[in-house]
Amino acid sequence: MAKKSDRKKLIDQLDKLSKQLIYQRDNYTCQHCGKNDGRDYQASHVIPVSAGMKLRWDLQNMKVLCYHCHLNWWHKNPLEASDWFNRTFPDRAKYLEENRGIYKFTEAELEELKADYTEQLKNNTHRF
């Protein structure tokens, strides 16, 4: 098996850190149905990663959904889900609309983001 590149390792670490921050921010609670049983929650992107990396780790672009709401509602009813997000989080929706686009992070930027997220988790100081 091929060894992971340093960039791929950073990407994996940032995925993990951003999920941890989102779980904490949203109190391990599905933002759609309110389920809070400590299991089956997922970090979900508003603007999909496939639309570009610019917002992949932007915490404003993420929310916690339970497994059911993520797969059976968010992905199957994108218009309804988008309307819900815009009504529920209008400031975040506006921010995302203004900041979407294609962007390629440098390795230094990835390292800086990783350090910032690690520090936020360590000190329980979130800047959402």
Segments and roles (model prediction):
Residues V49, W84, N99:
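Short acidic/histidine-centered micro-motifs embedded in hydrophobic/aromatic stretches
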Residues M1-L17, N36-D37, Y95-F128:
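A boundary/linker detector
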Residues K35-G38, M62-N86, P90:
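Short Cys/His-centered divalent metal-binding micro-motifs
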Residues C30, F89-E97:
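Short amphipathic alpha-helical segments with coiled-coil-like heptad repeat character
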Residues R7-D12, K19, G52-L55, L71:
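Short, surface-exposed loop/turn motifs that are enriched in glycine and acidic residues
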